[in-house]
């Protein structure tokens, strides 16, 4: 089943915004105004959140949560391109970039589209995406992101969808770098707690520990690579939106039937 994210987008309108949350977005993780019509599963929240409101109990940001950039560990594309020497080292030509498409994203599209079909599928996307430890992105995250920007629900994206996906990755990569305090190339439990707190989520350390353990690589050291960080944060945004839709009184509490809960989860996570 395709995700509901990103349906009806018109393509990105230029370069990725530099962590600047538009005034209209009233809560953590809201999309920039006019971007793809997606109420959840969007890029990370920006520097300016606007005023406060009663959503603090489950994801409302506090005022002015600062994010920053910084040099990514690893290769020049810091986690969303192949490392130097890999099969995608030579990028495609930047000529004839369609209007509204990021030129750098176009170069990557030209290279990643290995069958020259004019579309990128999940297999091609996975071949192009690397974590900071040079491991490939997991299948779940690749499919999730592809579906977010799959306008036609065909299991693939054209150059406009890829440009939007590329911008999405840029923004989440910057968030990952910001919260990777020890520059290890991964996010541990303490760093994840800081990240989610600054994004506006009021979650217990115990829950975050369980979250990290659940999504960390089996047999690993209890840390999140970039792919899992994106997956966790995106799904958390989605479920928070589902909760918010039911919380009409903005109290931080809702009553719903078991089937309603399952419907909300299935709609957003399948």
UniProtKB/Swiss-Prot annotation:
Residues 1-97 are annotated as: Disordered. Keywords: Calcium, Cytoplasm, Cytoplasmic vesicle, Endoplasmic reticulum, Membrane, Metal-binding, Repeat. Calcium-binding protein that acts as an adapter that bridges unrelated proteins or stabilizes weak protein-protein complexes in response to calcium. Acts as a negative regulator of ER-Golgi transport. It is a peripheral membrane protein. This is Peflin. Residues 100-135, 141-169, 170-202, 203-239, 240-269 form the EF-hand domain. SMART domains: EFh.
């Amino acid at each position: 089943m395709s995700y509901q994210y990103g349906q009806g987008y018109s393509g990105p309108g230029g370069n990725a915004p530099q962590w600047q949350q538009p005034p209209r977005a009233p809560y953590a993780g809201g999309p920039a105004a006019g971007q793809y019509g997606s109420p959840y599963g969007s890029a990370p929240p920006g520097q300016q959140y606007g005023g406060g409101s009663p959503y603090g109990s489950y994801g409302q940001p506090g005022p002015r949560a600062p994010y920053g950039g910084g040099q990514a560990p690893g290769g020049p594309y810091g986690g969303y391109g192949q490392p130097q020497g890999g099969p995608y080292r030579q990028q495609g030509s930047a000529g004839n970039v369609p209007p509204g498409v990021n030129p750098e994203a176009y170069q990557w599209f030209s290279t990643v589209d290995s069958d020259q079909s004019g579309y990128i599928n999940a297999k091609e996307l996975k071949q192009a995406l690397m974590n900071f430890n040079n491991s490939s992105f997991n299948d779940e995250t690749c499919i999730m992101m592809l579906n977010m920007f799959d306008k036609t629900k065909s299991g693939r994206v054209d150059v406009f969808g890829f440009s939007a996906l590329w911008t999405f990755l840029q923004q989440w990569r910057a968030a990952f770098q910001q919260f990777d305090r020890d520059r290890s190339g991964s996010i541990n439990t303490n760093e994840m707690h800081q990240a989610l707190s600054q994004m506006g989520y009021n979650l217990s350390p115990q829950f975050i520990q369980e979250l990290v353990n659940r999504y960390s690589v089996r047999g690993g050291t209890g840390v999140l690579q970039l792919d899992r960080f994106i997956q966790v944060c995106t799904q958390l945004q989605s479920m928070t939106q589902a909760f918010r839709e039911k919380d009409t009184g903005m109290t931080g509490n809702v009553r719903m039937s078991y089937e309603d809960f399952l419907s909300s989860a299935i709609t957003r996570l399948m």
